[in-house]
Amino acid sequence: MRISILQLVPVVGYIGFALGELYKPKNSISCSPNNPCPAEWPCCSPYNECGAGPICVGGCNVRSSFDEESCAPIPALVASQKLEFVSTPKVPKFIVNYQPKPPIREGNGPNKANTKVGVVEGELNSKRIIHYAKFLVTPDSKEAEKMLEDFDFTHSGYTSIEASSGNIVLAMPKKTTGSLITSTRSFLYGKASVRMKTARSRGVVTAFDLTSAIGDEIDFEWLGGDLMTAQSNYYSQGHLDYTRMQRFPVGADTWATYHTYEIDWDPDRIIWYVDGKIARTVLKKDTWDPISKEYRYPQTPMRLEIAVWPGGSETNGPGTINWAGGLIDWENSPDIIEKGQFTAHVEQITVTPYQNKFTEQVQFCIKAKKKAPTFSQKDLSRVVVSYNRQDRLNHHDEGSLKWDCFVTPKINDWLSSWKRSK
């Protein structure tokens, strides 16, 4: 369910003072294509709330923001790059690994929220993970360029690195709204693979999804009260259709056992894999909506997200609580008693973008601006994509995209937007 990541995770994990008060209004302002953000808080987040600063980076929804230049261009992951996290001492990095489109085939107590540089934040930074409120928020172009080279993921909430394994731990201490990691770059078609163990207990939800700034999404989700099953769904342009959700067996306890989950997405189909076996396939041709005369199929650049969130929170609506399996027992659940928190553990992440119709355009842009016949991985780190928002209410697809190179999409400070920072 899309509410999982879009409405809960971003508000967690502030200590000392409320970071959110500095880049969001005191009283929340909702945004939509019919009700865009005001000039003073110009950027609409993926959670349909207006703000500035880090809200204008990555997942900023141009359709619901103040104007077309409020959101910063989105850092892109393009063919010949590969984003990877591994739990060994190896440092993750972009790797040359061009792949054409493939054919269809058959603990010791809770951590503090990580908003200050310290031991936990330093460990995350060493794994190329940075707090989302810091990423690309700087007036210094050189510092922003270095962030693009140095960091592959952002985090919020109670994220840490497990000392014994090097795994990413996504934690949800008692009465909090969990943790989230997000890739710093978005890609248009490719394969995303995550090897992980999910959180357990009634009402606790673990999610791995691909999501775009304007509401395209492909999901895996796991309910903590049903550890033998995974759920899948997909959405287009923010149109939530829960009838498309399908469940399938995993084969072994998802909390006790590491499994590899993959989403393979191209212009014609989506395939969900569990441990190398196809669990579900959706063909674009089967998503045609005769009423809107559109394909309800994800076809805009998406970033990877992994989260733990409280579907069974008493603050949620009854539909969400029932879907999640009921209210969370914040006092007597085994992991709360033993560790003070629910946790999911991520051992490996790999994102490999496929070649798409814009690949040659991107390469031409780099060569033309460099005035050279070749390009480097560093050159690719400054490729960006944005949306041509001529009409807020129009359906967006590949034709809505604008690609550019040698662009550093920084935001000067927590009160700025892309327009104010250029």
From Swiss-Prot:
Its EC number is 3.2.-.-. Its main location: other. It is an enzyme of class 3 (hydrolase). GO terms for cellular component: ascospore wall; fungal-type cell wall; fungal-type vacuole. It comes from the Eukaryota. It is found in: Spore wall. GO terms for biological process: ascospore wall assembly; carbohydrate metabolic process; chitin metabolic process; fungal-type cell wall organization. Induction: Expression is increased in low copper conditions, probably through the transcription regulation by the copper regulon transcription factor MAC1. Keywords: Glycosidase, Hydrolase, Signal, Sporulation. Residues 1-20 form the signal peptide. The active site is at E217 (nucleophile), E221 (proton donor). GO terms for molecular function: glycosyltransferase activity; hydrolase activity, acting on carbon-nitrogen (but not peptide) bonds; hydrolase activity, hydrolyzing O-glycosyl compounds. InterPro entries: Beta_glucanase, ConA-like_dom_sf, GH16, Glycosyl_Hydrlase_16. Pfam families: Glyco_hydro_16 (PF00722). Residues 67-339 form the GH16 domain. CDD domains: ChtBD1_GH16, GH16_fungal_CRH1_transglycosylase. Spore specific glycosidase involved in spore wall assembly during sporulation. May be involved in copper import. Belongs to the glycosyl hydrolase 16 family. CRR1 subfamily. This is Probable glycosidase CRR1. It comes from Saccharomyces cerevisiae (strain ATCC 204508 / S288c) (Baker's yeast). The gene is CRR1.
